[in-house]
């Protein structure tokens, strides 16, 4: 009742507040702190209410970054520097980096345009193989390691079985049937499969959730709002930045003034991963959809950051296809679960349409909404397909670390990642 008075009479906020308390009543005890604190605090912030820590515990989630010295790991470190919910407590990497200060290890190989934050320079790197040591210090971990796929798969399961949730940027578990592969604006409901995964792993807190490949993060969001209107055939040609290979022009000078028409395994991921994203949960696993066919061609181009896709799509026979104007309106008005929850990293507008004939462009659009928006343009009718258009997204933000942070926010907001009741948290119970 106090909460309802605080948030006032705006029905959308008032109704959400009531639903959260109802959900909390039916939640396991260890999730109550998370749900009541983070989701309800968010509503109070919307109303600009100062509550100073007396009413609500303001403790942040303790986070680890596994693979912290690589390009994606560095991006995680930057994104989490001042995150309102997450605080980095552990930086983990390979044994050869373990025991050294993070600043010393990344000196000369810091790939970000922004300088290394002071707060990380003196943090001592932990060996990622020391699972218990890492897991005991954090509420969950992000994982972005450079290892063989079977080694990554085993390492992530070890963390999950140590009751440490893993939000992974890696591809190793993307097709594990009970591991959700999530774009929060598209298939947030797939996180429900975590309950089944925990049964298989024998865990109470631990699980693995993954983000999808960076190549499809531009065109799948644009296709998704139209899928229910009957889109059943897609051709996508992607033009992918060198940072997707973990490279810069300094480390890969061969890419200057060059195009490479091959990226190993990328076309298979681009064709198959959307089918799982658009799939459904059945008998304890995610079953891929069979109502859409995708073919893709992926090309490496001399761009630092930002993946572009040229997309062709057709609708089912007998279906009245929407007009260009209707499609643009659908794109511009689309909101997903991330926008409904107003997650910290979520773009206010997911899909931005540009009417200029020479947009979207990498330089002007890749950092739109902190690099988390998807830009679309040049929608027109096609001679072989029904429509064609161009889209782009930032591959290391929306397509990698930023997408994983957004997924973690979703998992926290929905109660799947909870604060551990360590000794310093017990007083706030």
Where are these regions (language model features)?
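Short terminal hydrophobic/aromatic SLiMs and anchors at protein ends
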Residues: 20, 27, 31-39, 48-49
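Basic polycationic patches enriched in arginine
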Residues: 5, 14-19, 25, 41
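Solvent-exposed polar/charged
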Residues: 4-5, 82, 228, 276
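Single conserved hydrophobic/aromatic residue that forms the stacking wall/gate
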Residues: 1-15, 421-429
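Charged docking surfaces used in two-component/phosphorelay signaling
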Residues: 243-423
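N-terminal Rossmann-like NAD(P) cofactor-binding subdomain of oxidoreductases
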Residues: 45, 51-261, 293, 368, ...
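Short stretches within intrinsically disordered, low-complexity N-terminal or propeptide regions
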Residues: 26, 31, 66, 427-428
């Amino acid at each position: 009742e106090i909460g309802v008075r605080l948030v006032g009479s705006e029905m959308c906020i008032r109704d959400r507040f009531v639903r959260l308390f109802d959900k909390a009543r039916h939640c396991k005890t260890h999730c109550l702190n998370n749900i009541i604190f983070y989701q309800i605090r968010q509503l109070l912030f919307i109303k600009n209410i100062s509550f100073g820590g007396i009413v609500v515990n303001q403790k942040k989630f303790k986070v680890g970054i596994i693979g912290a010295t690589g390009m994606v790991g560095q991006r995680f470190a930057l994104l989490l520097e001042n995150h309102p919910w997450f605080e980095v407590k552990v930086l983990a990497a390979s044994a050869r980096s373990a025991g050294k200060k993070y600043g010393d290890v990344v000196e000369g190989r810091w790939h970000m345009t922004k300088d290394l934050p002071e707060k990380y320079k003196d943090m001592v790197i932990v060996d990622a193989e020391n699972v218990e040591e890492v897991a005991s210090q954090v509420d969950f971990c992000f994982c972005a390691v450079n290892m063989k796929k079977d080694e990554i798969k085993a390492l992530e399961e070890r963390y999950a079985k140590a009751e440490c949730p893993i939000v992974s940027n890696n591809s190793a578990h993307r097709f594990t049937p009970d591991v959700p592969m999530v774009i929060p604006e598209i298939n947030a409901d797939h996180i429900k499969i975590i309950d089944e995964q925990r049964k298989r792993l024998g865990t109470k807190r631990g699980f693995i959730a993954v983000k999808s490949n960076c190549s499809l993060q531009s065109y799948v969001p644009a296709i998704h709002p139209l899928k229910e209107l009957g889109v059943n055939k897609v051709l996508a040609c992607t033009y992918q930045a060198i940072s997707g290979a973990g490279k810069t022009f300094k480390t890969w000078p061969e890419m200057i003034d060059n195009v490479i028409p091959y990226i190993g395994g990328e076309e298979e991921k681009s064709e198959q991963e959307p089918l799982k994203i658009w799939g459904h949960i059945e008998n304890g696993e995610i079953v891929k959809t069979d109502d859409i066919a995708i073919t893709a061609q992926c090309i490496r181009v001399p761009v630092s950051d930002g993946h572009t896709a040229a997309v062709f799509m057709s609708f089912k026979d007998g279906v009245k296809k929407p007009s260009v104007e209707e499609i643009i309106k659908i794109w511009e008005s689309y909101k997903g679960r991330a926008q409904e929850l107003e997650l910290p990293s979520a773009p206010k507008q997911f899909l931005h349409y540009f009417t200029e004939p020479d947009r979207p462009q990498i330089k002007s659009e890749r950092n739109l909404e902190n690099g988390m928006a998807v830009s679309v343009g040049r929608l027109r009718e096609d001679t072989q397909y029904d429509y064609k258009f161009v889209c782009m997204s930032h591959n290391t933000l929306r397509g990698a670390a930023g997408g994983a942070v957004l997924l973690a926010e979703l998992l926290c907001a929905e109660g799947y990642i909870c604060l551990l009741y360590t000794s310093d948290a017990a007083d706030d119970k």
